[in-house]
Amino acid sequence: ITTVDCSDYPKPVCSLEYMPLCGSDNKTYGNKCNFCNAVADSNGTLTLSHFGKC
């Protein structure tokens, strides 16, 4: 199973680095920071579907 460690999040500012991740909501997140902030906002209901665009 594919996982991302989001224990250091949420963070107030994300870099513009582009390394897309596909969330379980079928939305593409630009990088780990954006994805992990969304995970934090979802109270853990959002998970990683796979690396790369959805």
Curated annotation (Swiss-Prot):
Disulfide bonds join C6-C36, C14-C33, C22-C54. One of its GO terms (molecular function) is serine-type endopeptidase inhibitor activity. GO terms for cellular component: extracellular region. PROSITE patterns: KAZAL_1, KAZAL_2. Gene3D superfamilies: 3.30.60.30. Keywords: Disulfide bond, Glycoprotein, Protease inhibitor, Repeat, Secreted, Serine protease inhibitor. InterPro entries: Kazal-type_SerProtInhib, Kazal_dom, Kazal_dom_sf, Prot_inh_Kazal-m. Pfam families: Kazal_1. The record marks L16, E17 as: Reactive bond 3. It is found in: Secreted. Residues 4-54 form the Kazal-like domain. It comes from the Eukaryota. Glycans are attached at N43. The keyword Transcription regulation does not apply. Avian ovomucoid consists of three homologous, tandem Kazal family inhibitory domains. This is Ovomucoid. It comes from Guira guira (Guira cuckoo).
